[in-house]
Amino acid sequence: MSISQPERVLIIKLRHHGDVLLSTPVVDALKHKFPDCEVDMLVYAATTDVILDNRQISNIFTIDREWKKQGVRVQLAHEKALFKSLKARNYDWAFNISDQWRAAFLAKLCAHYSAGIACCKRDNFLWRHCHDFLNEELDTSHHMVESNLNVLQPLVLPEEYPAKVRMEISPANRESVLEKLSAQGWNGEPYVLAHPGARWFFKCWEDGKNAALLQLLLLNGKNVVLTASPDAAEQEMVQSILGRLKIPDGVHVWVLSGCLNLRELAAAIDGA
């Protein structure tokens, strides 16, 4: 074990899909400076899709939010199994880029050295005790990627690595999207992809405005692929938008609603 030449590192990011994706430059920065280092990640189970094909990551460990609904005994069994798996990896470093106590405790207990962010809301003895190194919490004038990379300062200075968000897409997921499009009559035509839904509906544009934009694209000869998650509200949104469209001759609208995982959605976006 070496503090300056790590062989095994754990990155903890317990947040949403986008937050996990924006943590991938941390993995890249470590692999850039320490190519032989094994980098693992601990994330919520629901967010694994965005990093599942990332070849820079050796192992992905997960916490399922459903554990707490299964009763205290079952939850404790899951937590114990997770702790045992993490401890067995014998990490040189754990980098906590979350603000949860669970992440702080695991970082402290599962690695020789732990680093985190000096969060304002965690300005207390216990948070400091859980981390051997605490880096400054950057203000909102900095991008989240910069804030994430800032946690690496004991090993990697931010200026040493050009930040790059990475979401790899496997050939199998690319092929799956092509098959699903082909099943709807797509024959390789270029398309514009629209994904009007979101986890939080306050972020969504109005159905009428989405439809007006897509109608304009169709009138200008652009084919459209319309995607949505399996969520019932998003399905309803797609139907509402489709019901407002008048599709001219010679152009197409293909709907991939509720049938794509996140990696397939990324492949569809990449093909647009």
For the regions a language model picked out, list residue spans one by one:
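Catalytic machinery of carbohydrate-active enzymes
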Residues: 1-272
